[in-house]
Amino acid sequence: METYGEAALLRTAKTALEAQGFCAEDFCDAAIEGLARLDEQGEAQYVRSLHAYLSSGLNLRRAAETMGIHRNTLAYRMRRIEARFALNLGDMNTCFELLFSLWLRDGIGGEVQPESTEPFDSGAVSAALWRFTERTGGAEAPCGGRFKLAVAAVGVGNMGDEKRMELTLALCALPQKPVAAFDEETLFLALPPEEIDAFAEAAGPLCEAARAGLVISQPFAMERLNARLRLCRLALLAAGVQTMEMRDMGSTLFFMALERKISLAPYLCEDVIRVMDEDATRGSALSRALYAYLLNFMDLKKAAQQLGIHRNTLEYQVRKMNAVIGEPPDGSKRFRMMCTYKMLALPDTGVHDV
């Protein structure tokens, strides 16, 4: 992000995403929109509180001072956020994805949509799923309806016909009775949002045994179905044969979508490249240590535990990193450096049309 900066990336991203039928909300954790709705109802400043907490490096005292509230008040809000949206703010990847969602929402996000009360319409979903899987290069038919649904997508492209049918029948026979449609590459299974967790728990072992990738979407409005199904295909490319929640990979999917339209090279943080060059020249492993340090919001103890090394060893490595990049990263640079790691870790799919 050094050459053009964050503002340029956001402007370019908005154009590139719209050209593919995506919007910012497709890549954001749904909890952020839920928090924004609570804020509009006057409950509390949840979005601002979460942003302050994440931007402060998960430091409650510093974040509370920024907010001008008591530390205990902020701690209570964080506990409510965790409970209400099934989040674990002790998981560093979750925290980064939430921070990324806030950044994207602030940069190019749209208006907060009211919560839908329309019931799940299995007939409409089935028809739309089959239209999507049977299209032959033509424009996607629009999907009507504001009711919410969630989708599980299974990668079946490498399976023989018999094995594919066996897995399809097993998944469709689960108690949740999903609405299903498929083509040669992907099996899509749609359910009401309240049933997706139970379905994922039951489907995971079946897909693992079949060595088939499984990705689970977040709840979304029916009108976004076509875009979310294409996003599921992207997620399967990243997941391989793993089972993954798409809320845990929003930043990866965002950069995968961008890479299909633009080169990401001008937006890489040069400091990360310098550290990697240092590793290549001297045979060191500073880049791995830097990633753990950044992911853990520059908490030496947590990062050292993740790496399985002594805290003092990591502290020494951090001093060497700082000598390479010139100065310790602040919160803003930490975010840019983490985004660079995400860009560099994108799967090499060789595909340029979802």
Language-model-derived ranges and their functions:
Residues 1-354:
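Cytosolic nucleotide-utilizing catalytic cores of signal-transduction proteins
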